[in-house]
């Protein structure tokens, strides 16, 4: 199958799952099809899916992620003050390293808003549907929503990274409290503990809680370091 054929197969499969979606016209241009496929993947609940679909999805995403560009962490230069620390600005889903960190909500199932620009959406989109299925399995076994400041680990699936660490940061309601600061610090330490237990040697953190969770960026950076 060509990449175009894979994309069209995946779209047709997902549209046929839901009758309302099935009546939607499929765009003829590549960008329109990519946006539609991403949207369909974003909104799909964590229910069983065929092995044939997953095989073609994995082939599609493997090539798609190569097309998007991959940055190997080994090619980056550390900061002058600490040879273990790197500062990099870019799309974390394109990093080739041992682990990347995902900023999640307490359901831990990824972002269900079509085409949303959050990191949770990007990671689930380019990792593939196996990630949502795995997180559903983990959370069903846990039996309750994820606590703030804790972390889980999964495979990276179709991403260049080996693993994904999932953590829930504090949500700031009015002003930052000591508890908020402690919980944010816990996100980092819990991820590092899981990474060490798994043998991870390189880990890429995104900014935690500084987006829609409203943690002030300067203070969050101080806590992270």
Model regions and ranges:
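Macrodomain-like recognition of ADP-ribose-binding/processing modules
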Residues: 1-225
